[in-house]
């Protein structure tokens, strides 16, 4: 009985030392990287020739494309990415999924998206949408 009590006490002590909090993504982890969109809400993205992408430059300058090109200054705070003054071209695309993704990325960056970076996978998520990207830097 003493061994069981000692084991339970030790287990509780060790569990108290483990943190389940996620570590927030930092600007340095995103800057100078390009990511290509793989899925929206778990469903694969189809594109003809130019895959939807997002890139992060100096001072968190964001640029990318869905159907249209977009760019703006991003802000990353407590794991949330925003870009309030996002500029975007406005052309209609033949692919309706890409047209809808223009609205999705614009809304996400305006309202704020939770960012997760695990290995080579970037996830931007809100209560309504989840965009999953794969690291695809142009140069190694």
UniProtKB/Swiss-Prot annotation:
Keywords: Stress response
Recorded coiled-coil stretches: none
UniProt-listed InterPro entries: DUF306_Meta_HslJ, HslJ-like_sf, Hsp_HslJ-like
Keyword rRNA-binding set for record: no
GO BP, sorted A to Z: response to heat
Protein's name in the database: Heat shock protein HslJ
Name of the encoding gene: hslJ
């Amino acid at each position: 009985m003493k061994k069981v009590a000692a084991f339970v006490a030790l287990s509780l002590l060790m569990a108290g030392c483990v943190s389940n909090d996620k570590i927030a993504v930092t600007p340095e982890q995103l800057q100078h990287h390009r990511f290509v969109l793989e899925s929206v809400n778990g469903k694969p993205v189809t594109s003809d020739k130019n895959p939807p992408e997002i890139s992060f430059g100096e001072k968190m300058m964001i640029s990318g494309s869905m159907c249209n090109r977009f760019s703006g200054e991003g802000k990353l705070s407590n794991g949330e990415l925003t870009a309030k003054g996002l500029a975007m071209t406005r052309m209609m695309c033949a692919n309706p999924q890409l047209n809808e993704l223009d609205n999705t990325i614009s809304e996400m960056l305006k309202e704020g998206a939770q960012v997760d970076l695990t290995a080579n996978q970037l996830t931007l998520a809100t209560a309504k949408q989840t965009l999953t990207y794969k690291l695809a830097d142009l140069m190694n």
